[in-house]
Amino acid sequence: MTNKYRNQKVVTPHGTFDSKREYRRYQELMLLQRAGKISELRRQVKYELLPSQRLNGKCVERPLYYIADFVYTQDGETVVEDVKGYRDPASAGYAKYVIKRKLMLYRYGIRVREVG
């Protein structure tokens, strides 16, 4: 099955990954964790960027989330990674990602690390 970015999903004993590239990165991070270079490796971590908006007690806008591919601790710092393949600045999907990346920095003080 392909997703919106035409990547092939990868099903493994460790779970389902959005692409082969993402699964390879997961394997690399697992090796780094076993070697003690990183710790607390997590996948698909959800961050709320904007809460739901209410007007007269009714929800008029749902919350906005960013889902990080990987989150881990390295040298006492939280690292958030997003695995990126081809980047098309003209695409709507990439534009949404850039906005969410900027909101992560603004709201949480975390700069998303893009890996390819």
Would you name each region that the model predicts?
Residues 1-116:
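Electrostatic, structured charged patches in enzyme active sites and in nucleic-acid/phosphate-binding
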